[in-house]
Each structure stands twice: as structure tokens, then as C-alpha cells.
Amino acid sequence: MDNHNSSHQLYKKAMALVLAGGRGSRLYNLTDTRAKPAVYFGGKFRIIDFALSNCLNSGIRRIGVVTQYKSHSLLRHLQRGWGFLRGELNEFIDLLPAQQRVDEEHWYRGTADAVYQNIDILRSYGPEYVIVLAGDHIYKMDYSIMLRDHAQSGYKCTVGCVEIAKEEAYAFGIMGIDENRKITSFIEKPKKNAPTIPGTTDRCYASMGIYIFNSDYLYDLLEEDITNKESSHDFGKDIIPRVVSENQALAHPFSMSCVPRGEGIEPYWRDVGTIDAFWEANLDLAANMPELNIYDKDWPVWTAQEQLPPAKFVPDRNGNHGVITNTLASGGCIVLGSEISKSLMFSKVRVLAGCKIDQCVIMPEVVVGENCRLKKVVIDKGCDIPAGMVIGEDPIEDAKNFYRTDKGVVLVTKKMIDELKEK
């Protein structure tokens, strides 16, 4: 059987489960009203769109999305933008809120518990393979290649991994592997002595939060884990170490299935779990030749498409045209005679005359008043920035009025602006 037909058969035997219930507390006020996977990204998308688009582009069209924390924004996005799959062809995105399966007092207590509470639903669909995905990372990956790697390996679990510098290991689940990619150890966020990639002393394989299981094996693991009172019911802390101890875990390097892939191409994967990382990943897209290609017709990123007019850039009342460089502007934006560089503007942003905006991420429906100066600022949806406001130049004032990171990125929300206006 050739690879195409083999992959097609595997598609039909697999179901993806996207874990999208996390709060993302390190994003601070950006997740006050929405779950992390529902946070805006890249000028027009939501973070979860990348995992879901990978599923569709990989041929995986049976998808469950597990939700919990402040899920209204996420559910509305999925209903408006992802309702085009055809149930009569056994294609679907099934929305799975917390079931309180264990008792009426507990919601999802961990990533493994989130899957366990939907185990009956999974069984009803009868997949041979379950693909467990984190819904809060930015990357493009062909899951069908990983699925084929898993099916051909004979292992019961395959873990997607990305190469990182050893000094970054403290923030990830790190795996040790042998020359055949069998995972021999798995340590969640090691503070020291992280296992390195064979043949290197300064590189590690970090878990991407992507797992493929033989379904029956996964169900057995979850049913055993739920009875363990000492378990935190988490894949990284409990399930994967158990699989490793049973010699059933294979490592799948991201370089094998990243999109695009090939010699000289650096795989792009970002955990946007902090304000700094979120800001940096967004601004990556403003580069002349960004590492993440969102213009790729062969691997599109799908999302909800609001019907809006094109962005418009016009002179101010004095005829000043302004200058726009290395900037992405979504539909419905209007900019009057301002200077904007290396920034992203989501839909329906208004920038009035005389502004200077540099390295900013401006979310939908923001109005920037006249003569504002903004540098290294992330502005949440719906903010009305008063005329003449300066943000990003005075660290003391920024920290007093807004949230400022150690790297100097300033987060501005509607609540912060409203409180500032009341002073």
C-alpha cells in the first residue's frame, strides 16, 4: 500500500482532541475575559486556529475541543468560524465542556483528567488512534506524518518534541532518547541535569504537548490514573512518565513533520504563554521574510472571516500622509497621517492623526487618539487610547498605570485605560 493510501486509511482511524480549557495566567490581563486559546494572534486569527488548521490540512476531520475556563469567547469563535465541516461525511468539531464526571464538585483537574472526563464520547466515535493536542501554541505541522510514524513504529504512544537550548529546559517537559528515538526518560521542567539530545551537550528535546496514543492503551492509562489519589492527572507529570516506564513511548522530532520542512529550514514553534513571548511571536510576522508563513496557500490558517472593507490609509486634515512600514493591517482599519512601523493591527482599528507607533500589537476595535506615541505595547480589544498619550517611553509611569514586563513590553487593557481616565 503506498503512503497516500496508507495515510488516508489512518485519517479515518484517528480523532484529534484539542485541549483548550487553560487560563494562561502568565498572559495576565489578556486572559481576564477569555481562555488562552481564544486570545487574538497574527492580525486576524485566534491562537487555537493553528492547531485546528493543522488538523484540517493534515486530513484529520474528527476533532473534539475540550473547553473550561471563560469559554464563551472561544465557543463563539468556533461556532462562527469552524462550522463548515460536514457531519454527513463524518467530519465534525465537537465542543466538550467540563463534564464533572468524577463528582459534582470538580471540573477538569489536569490535562489527563480533561480527556478522561470525555472518555465515553471518545469511545462512541471508535477511533483507533487519539491525537491529543495543546490548543495554545503557534506552529504549522503535518499531523499525518506523525500519525504514520506512530502507526509504523509499534509503540503505543508517540510524543511530538522540539529541539531547544539546554538553558531553556526549565520551562518544558524534557525527554531523554536513545539512538532509535525511544524515550528513555521524561522530566517535567527540570531545574538542572536535563537530558540532552544524543551527540550534543547543549540541546534538548522538549515536549510540544502533542501525543498520539493507541486508543485502548490511552483509555486504560486514564482509568488507572483517575484512581490514583497522588496523581495530578496531568499528561506531562503523570501519564507520559508512566508510558516511558513501560517502554512504550517514541519521540517524534518536529523537524520530521513541520510545514514547510527541508534542509536549511528552521522549524517554527512558539509557546506564547507569556506577554513577552506573545509580543515577540506576533512581531515575527512583521519581518520582511517571516519564519512563519501565513500566506502559504498549500497550508492555510483557517479562522472566522468577518465581512469588512479593506484597510485604508489616508492623509490627515493638513495633508500629511504618514509612513507605514513592516506592518500588518486587517480589514476595517483606518489610519490617518501617522507613522507606524513593525506592528500588527487587527480588525476595525482606528489610528488618528499625528501618531507614532512602533513594535505594537493592536487588537480589534481599538481607537488611538491624535498625537499618541506608542512603543512595544500590546493593546487589548476595545481600548480607547486618549489623545496625546505616551506609552513605552517611561518605565516608571508604564509600570504604575499598566502592566510592564522586565523586557519592557507594556500591556494595556480597557480596564486600565478606564481607571486611568478616572484619576
From Swiss-Prot:
List residues traversing the bilayer: none
Q: What is this protein called?
A: Glucose-1-phosphate adenylyltransferase
Gene it is expressed from:
glgC
The organism is Francisella tularensis subsp. holarctica (strain LVS)
* UniProt keyword ATP-binding, yes or no: yes
Among InterPro entries, the record links this protein to:
ADP-Glc_PPase (IPR011831), ADP_Glu_pyroP_CS (IPR005836), GlgC_bac (IPR023049), GlmU/GlgC-like_hexapep (IPR056818), NTP_transferase_dom (IPR005835), Nucleotide-diphossugar_trans (IPR029044), Trimer_LpxA-like_sf (IPR011004)
Catalysis performed (reactions) = alpha-D-glucose 1-phosphate + ATP + H(+) = ADP-alpha-D-glucose + diphosphate
Q: What is the lineage of its organism?
A: Bacteria, Pseudomonadati, Pseudomonadota, Gammaproteobacteria, Thiotrichales
Which family does the record claim for this protein? Belongs to the bacterial/plant glucose-1-phosphate adenylyltransferase family.
- Pathway as given in its UniProt record: Glycan biosynthesis; glycogen biosynthesis
Query: Which PANTHER family does the record associate with it?
Result: GLUCOSE-1-PHOSPHATE ADENYLYLTRANSFERASE (PTHR43523:SF2), GLUCOSE-1-PHOSPHATE ADENYLYLTRANSFERASE-RELATED (PTHR43523)
- EC number(s) stated in the UniProt entry for this protein: 2.7.7.27
* SUPFAM superfamilies the UniProt entry points to: Nucleotide-diphospho-sugar transferases (SSF53448), Trimeric LpxA-like enzymes (SSF51161)
Give the molecular function GO annotations.
ATP binding; glucose-1-phosphate adenylyltransferase activity
Task: List ligand-binding residues for alpha-D-glucose 1-phosphate.
Answer: 108, 173, 188-189, 207
Record's keyword annotation contains Hydrolase: no
Keywords associated with the record: ATP-binding, Carbohydrate metabolism, Glycogen biosynthesis, Glycogen metabolism, Nucleotide-binding, Nucleotidyltransferase, Transferase
Q: What is the annotated quaternary arrangement, including any partners?
A: Homotetramer.
Q: Name one GO biological process term.
A: glycogen biosynthetic process
Q: What does this protein do?
A: Involved in the biosynthesis of ADP-glucose, a building block required for the elongation reactions to produce glycogen. Catalyzes the reaction between ATP and alpha-D-glucose 1-phosphate (G1P) to produce pyrophosphate and ADP-Glc.
